[in-house]
């Protein structure tokens, strides 16, 4: 590994400690570029990349949800002037979301997926590709939303095929994929039955093999299993009585694997 690549990794860790996530993204993009000879990222590097983008996108997703909620309230009150201002502001956030998603999707397509050689790294990156297409589908409309949803489905399905063939049901990356795939069915495709079936199957298969779970991934796997169960409880009650509580999804890669 080149010394410049080591330096970028170190700077990314510094940026993470300082909670300067935009700069963390920049440093991790340089790590990917430094490994461009077809060399795969280490597990630590790919987790740092995921944390960087997750924080940068997470802040904007939260902003978008808050602004959209205010917009609905102002519309219901008939405050047209306010609604116009809010729409302009929401568009600014959506431009940032689009730019961030396009940035990581480009890295995934041009470098990361192609260089992945192991089952867990292939699933990790394909899941990531699905996640960022899903984030686009959250706010896009019309044909753009349809395209983002189709890309999400295709990425998650590719990841699922590899996960089912190569990763144990208790593997945290396989569980994290099932968690986010089920959220996609529920939130984007409005298919609560499919969401519940996927989440329940993943949970049941993991429970059946819980005694084989190694100590190193026990904490990560059981955390995601708890999120799967929480969502199942929430969705089942929502199907009987529409709730407003937000879905749980994997927030950080260290909730998925070491």
Curated annotation (Swiss-Prot):
Coiled coil (residue ranges): none
Cited SMART domains: 14_3_3
Any single biological process term in GO: protein localization
Phylogenetic classification of the source organism: Eukaryota, Viridiplantae, Streptophyta, Embryophyta, Tracheophyta
UniProt-recorded name of the protein: 14-3-3-like protein F
InterPro entries: 14-3-3 (IPR000308), 14-3-3_CS (IPR023409), 14-3-3_dom_sf (IPR036815), 14-3-3_domain (IPR023410)
Organism of this sequence: Nicotiana tabacum
Residues in the signal sequence: none
Pfam families in the cross-refs: 14-3-3
GO CC list: cytoplasm
Assigned protein family: Belongs to the 14-3-3 family.
């Amino acid at each position: 590994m080149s010394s410049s690549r080591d330096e970028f990794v170190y700077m990314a860790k510094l940026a993470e400690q300082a909670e300067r996530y935009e700069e963390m993204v920049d440093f991790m993009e340089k790590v990917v570029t430094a490994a461009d000879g077809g060399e795969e990222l280490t597990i630590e590097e790919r987790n740092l990349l995921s944390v960087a983008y997750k924080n940068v996108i997470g802040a904007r997703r939260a902003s978008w949800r808050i602004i959209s909620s205010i917009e609905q309230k102002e519309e219901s009150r008939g405050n047209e002037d306010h609604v116009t201002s809010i729409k302009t502001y929401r568009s600014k956030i959506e431009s940032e979301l689009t730019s961030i998603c396009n940035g990581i999707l480009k890295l995934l397509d041009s470098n990361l997926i192609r260089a992945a050689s192991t089952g867990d790294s292939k699933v990790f990156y394909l899941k990531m590709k699905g996640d960022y297409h899903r984030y686009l589908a959250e706010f896009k409309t019309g044909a753009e939303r349809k395209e983002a949803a189709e890309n999400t489905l295709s990425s998650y399905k590719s990841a699922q095929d590899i996960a089912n063939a190569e990763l144990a049901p208790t593997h945290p990356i396989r569980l994290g994929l099932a968690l986010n795939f089920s959220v996609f069915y529920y939130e984007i495709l409005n298919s609560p039955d499919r969401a519940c079936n996927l989440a329940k199957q993943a949970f049941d298969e993991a429970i059946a093999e819980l005694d084989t779970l190694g100590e190193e991934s026990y904490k990560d796997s059981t955390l995601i299993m708890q999120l799967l169960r929480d969502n199942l409880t929430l969705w089942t009650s929502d199907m009987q009585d529409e709730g407003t509580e937000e879905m749980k999804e994997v927030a950080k890669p260290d909730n998925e694997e070491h």
